[in-house]
Amino acid sequence: MEKQMHIAMLIGALTKGGAERVLVNLADYFVEKGYRVTMVTQYERENEYPLNRKVNRIISDITEEETGKSRLLNFGRRFLKLRKIWKKERPDVILSFIGKNNMMAILTSRFLNIPVAVSVRAEPSEEYYTPLLKWLARHLFARADGVILQTRRCFDFFPAKVRKKAVILKNPISQSFFRERYEGERDKTIVAVGRVDANKNHEMLIRAFAQIAEEFPAYRLIIYGEGELRPCLLDLIKELNLTDRILMPGSIDNVADVIYKSAIFVLPSNTEGTPNTLIEAMIMGLCVVATDCPCGGPADLIENGYNGILTPVMNEEKMKENLQFLLNNLQKMEELGKNAAKTADIFRPEIVYGEWEKFLRSLT
């Protein structure tokens, strides 16, 4: 009988974000297919994605009693604790997501004969934003057995010795988004979904919508998500006297159901990897507008004017013009949405999960 393969996954926490959702989806797929899966997170937070009960969850952070005043000593304790986890669990492969977790996965598993795959989920220069982190990423990743990147542009950040072991793997998308495209009269809503922080730049979208709100009085802008900037944006909406036209309901679990009949989906981010929310909206056949941001995720998905609209980063005026154009051209909006729905063909779960499975198995 073939030995049950054991996959360990490492991430900071399972709070609601794109990378976390991808990893939770992967864990669910592998454990349901008969793999043994251990999810190692540094923390356990409120408002996390639910994890399949068959997945073993381990918290790797040091306890309050173990925490001292020295940051260096605390790092050493975290390092040793994570290394002990690898020694005890003996996974066949470690899959790490995001930033410093990737470095810790490589360092703590040294000489344990456990293959490591690290995944950069955003623009590398944003994830490794200091000269030291940049240097460490470029050198340490050469010691990984596999490197997973989001777009071709990401390859430029790394030296040849990293690029030669790097691959692009698509994001696994929840089955709930794969449904027949809605062909009826659409709700007069423009929607955005994502963490409410500076990088997502919902402020630009709010200000752009404010410029056309009077021209299109039937339309509302709805931004779904939580984050540190939510109170500030609610204040801005109040200042603009648009509290009845721009809504921020917070985080939701049933995204597919809620945005299914929406007129336009907007991604206003300053930087992105390959955005789950954009893929999900396109799969369901929404008309999409997205910033042409680094590291090129939206541009990899959208053929401008065919299956969506690409708009310049941090350009409120262009965002306004693109929304205005679409709301004045409903036939074009419908055409873009129909073409966007064709994206579903390349993101079928059986295809995407199969690519991840094949890659991880190739490392063992």
Segments predicted by a language model, with ranges:
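N-terminal strand-loop element at the rim of the active site
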Residues: 9-17, 21-25, 29-73, 157-159, ...
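Aromatic "clamp/platform" in nucleotide-sugar-dependent glycosyltransferases that forms part
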Residues: 251, 270
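Short hydrophobic beta-strand element within catalytic cores of glycosyltransferases
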Residues: 287-292
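Conserved acidic donor-binding segment of nucleotide-sugar-dependent glycosyltransferases
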Residues: 303-305, 309-316, 325-330
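A short, well-ordered alpha-helix in the C-terminal region of glycosyltransferases
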Residues: 318, 325, 332-346, 355-358
